[in-house]
Regions:
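A short, N-terminal "cap"/entry segment at the start of jelly-roll beta-barrel domains
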Residues: 1-42, 57, 129-138
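Residue-level recognition of conserved beta-strand positions in structured domain cores
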Residues: 47, 60, 79-81, 107, ...
């Protein structure tokens, strides 16, 4: 459910009204601000969840910058041409991903979800999955 304030064009999306987006590997993403939900044209926000011991597929975004905030959990953020760079991430960290940057979030916990708040500067993203790169064991 979301509420639309006609006077100011403010849209409030409740958790029950979030838009189910793509699955990328084991990662799921629910949008709260999107073109469909709020009519946004220059921003998008979502919550991405990576279950314990799992990861997204390796990928990059063609048309947008992304900013992520680690809201819960810990893991790694793989990046680089061959995903050879592994940075540990944990609650409170911010991550900037430019267009075209290969990346893959990985949840190393055996018990906790890795929860990422995702913002990007385009209402619809164009994603290229990198089937031959990244972790395959998660």
């Amino acid at each position: 459910m979301h509420q639309h304030d006609e006077g100011s064009s403010i849209v409030i999306t409740k958790p029950s009204g979030m838009e189910i987006e793509i699955n990328s590997g084991a990662m799921t993403r629910l949008a709260g601000v999107s073109e469909m939900l709020s009519g946004s044209t220059g921003i998008h926000m979502a919550v991405a969840t990576v279950p314990p011991g799992r990861c997204s597929t390796a990928h990059y975004h063609v048309n947008c910058e992304s900013a992520l905030y680690v809201a819960a959990g810990k893991g790694a953020f793989l990046s680089g041409e061959e995903l050879e760079i592994e940075n540990e991430i944990a609650f409170g960290d911010f991550i900037y991903v430019p267009p075209g940057a290969n990346h893959q979030p990985v949840n190393y916990s055996k018990t906790e979800d890795l929860v990422l708040i995702v913002a990007r500067n385009a209402p619809v993203e164009i994603v290229v999955e990198l089937e031959n790169l990244g972790r395959k064991d998660c």
